[in-house]
UniProtKB/Swiss-Prot annotation:
Gene Ontology molecular-function annotations: acyl binding; acyl carrier activity
Top-level taxon of the source organism: Bacteria
Matching Pfam families: PP-binding (PF00550)
Family: Belongs to the acyl carrier protein (ACP) family.
Pathway: Lipid metabolism; fatty acid biosynthesis
Predominant subcellular localization, coarse grouping: cytoplasm
GO biological process: lipid A biosynthetic process
HAMAP family assigned to the protein according to its UniProt record, in alphabetical order: Acyl_carrier
Name by which UniProt lists this protein: Acyl carrier protein
GO cellular component: cytosol; membrane
Species of provenance: Streptococcus pneumoniae serotype 4 (strain ATCC BAA-334 / TIGR4)
Subcellular location: Cytoplasm
Protein role: Carrier of the growing fatty acid chain in fatty acid biosynthesis.
Gene, per the UniProt record: acpP
InterPro entries for the chain: ACP, ACP-like_sf, PP-bd_ACP
Length: 74
């Protein structure tokens, strides 16, 4: 499974969104994600990819998150 598809799956599950709403261009504001939602999404992604996502990263869109995961998973 590609990184985007797995990230999308986690966001859909954690935020209760339709997969069509979760695109690379979607911001977390667009997805109505508050800080607790984002924490849960990041926690699931860290577990799924066995990486650590630092809090100071400026991840505003799903695409930003996917790019970060791809870089860390290398």
């Amino acid at each position: 499974m590609a990184v985007f598809e797995k990230v999308q799956e986690i966001i859909v599950e954690e935020l209760g969104k339709d997969a069509s709403e979760v695109t690379l261009e979607s911001t977390f504001d667009d997805l109505d994600a508050d800080s607790l939602d984002l924490f849960q999404v990041i926690s699931e992604i860290e577990d799924a990819f066995d990486i650590q996502i630092e809090a100071e990263n400026d991840l505003k869109t799903v695409g930003d998150l996917v790019a970060y995961v791809e870089e860390q998973a290398k």
